[in-house]
C-alpha cells in the first residue's frame, strides 16, 4: 500500500513538473482535482470514505475551504509535527506533492464534490451524556454539527467516530493545536483539554447521532 502510494505520488509530481517545465501550469478546477486525487486514493478510498487501519478519515463532502486549510496546515508543518503522529506525518509528506499553484484548491474542490458517506460508528459511548458536553462544541460547530466557515469550525456530523476521538486526543496531548501560527487549532485545544477520556467518548457518541444529509 505504501509503495503504491509513493508510485502514484511520484507520477503526479512528474506530470506536474513536466507541465511547469513547459511553462503550462495545469488549469485549476474539478478535473485537475480528480487527477490529483489519485495521490489520496490509496488511503482515503475512491469515494473518500477513509480507512481506519491507515488513520485516514472520511473526507467525502468536506467543504473545500476546510480541506484547503488543512492541506496548507500540513504543508506548513502546523499539523503532522508530533514525532509519534504516524498518520499526520504521512499526510504532511503527501501534502508536499501538491506544489503547483492551484493544486490545493483543485483537490479540495474535488473532495467537496464527493457524496458524504456517514461511516458507521465503531466506538462505545453514552450519546445522552455526550449531548450535554456537546453544548460547548455547538458554540462553534453548530447544534447540528454542520460547522461554521466564518470561525473556521469544520463540520463534525458524518465524520468517523474513531477519527473524531483521535483528533480530540491529539489536541489534548499537544500533537495538534500548539503551533502559534495555527490560530484556530489553538482555539480548539483548550476545549479538548477540558474533556476526560469518558467525556470524549460520550461527545463523539452524540456527534454520531448527527448525520450529513445526502445530496
List PLM regions with ranges.
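Bacterial N-terminal signal peptides that target proteins for export
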Residues: 1-11
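C-terminal motif of bacterial Sec signal peptides marking the signal peptidase cleavage site
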Residues: 19-21
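His/Cys-centered metal/cofactor-coordination and adjacent catalytic loops
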Residues: 23-26, 49, 58-60, 109-121, ...
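Sequence/structural segment immediately N-terminal to covalent heme-attachment motifs in c-type
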Residues: 25-47, 122-146, 215
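The feature marks the first
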Residues: 30, 35-76
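Disulfide-stabilized extracellular ectodomain repeats and their linkers
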Residues: 37-40, 56, 64, 88, ...
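Axial heme c-ligation environment in periplasmic c-type cytochrome domains
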Residues: 52-58, 74-104, 120-125, 150-155, ...
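An amphipathic alpha-helix signature
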Residues: 64, 68-76, 104-108, 112, ...
Amino acid at each position: 500500500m505504501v509503495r503504491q502510494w509513493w508510485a502514484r505520488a511520484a507520477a503526479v509530481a512528474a506530470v506536474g513538473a513536466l507541465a511547469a517545465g513547459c511553462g503550462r501550469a495545469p488549469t485549476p478546477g474539478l478535473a485537475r482535482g480528480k487527477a490529483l486525487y489519485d495521490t489520496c486514493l490509496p488511503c482515503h478510498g475512491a469515494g473518500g470514505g477513509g480507512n481506519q487501519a491507515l488513520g485516514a478519515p472520511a473526507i467525502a463532502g468536506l467543504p473545500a475551504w476546510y480541506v484547503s486549510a488543512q492541506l496548507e496546515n500540513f504543508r506548513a508543518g502546523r499539523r503532522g509535527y508530533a514525532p509519534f503522529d504516524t498518520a499526520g506525518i504521512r499526510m504532511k509528506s503527501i501534502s508536499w506533492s501538491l506544489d503547483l499553484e492551484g493544486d490545493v484548491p483543485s483537490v479540495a474542490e474535488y473532495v467537496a464534490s464527493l457524496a458524504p458517506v456517514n461511516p458507521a460508528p465503531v466506538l462505545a459511548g453514552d450519546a445522552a451524556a455526550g449531548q450535554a458536553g456537546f453544548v460547548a462544541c455547538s458554540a462553534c460547530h453548530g447544534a447540528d454539527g454542520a460547522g461554521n466557515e466564518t470561525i473556521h469550525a469544520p463540520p463534525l456530523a458524518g465524520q468517523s467516530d474513531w477519527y473524531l476521538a483521535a483528533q480530540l486526543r491529539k489536541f489534548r496531548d499537544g500533537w495538534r493545536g500548539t503551533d502559534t501560527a495555527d490560530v484556530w487549532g489553538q482555539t480548539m485545544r483548550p476545549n479538548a483539554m477540558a474533556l476526560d477520556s469518558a467525556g470524549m467518548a460520550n461527545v463523539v457518541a452524540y456527534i454520531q447521532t448527527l448525520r450529513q444529509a445526502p445530496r
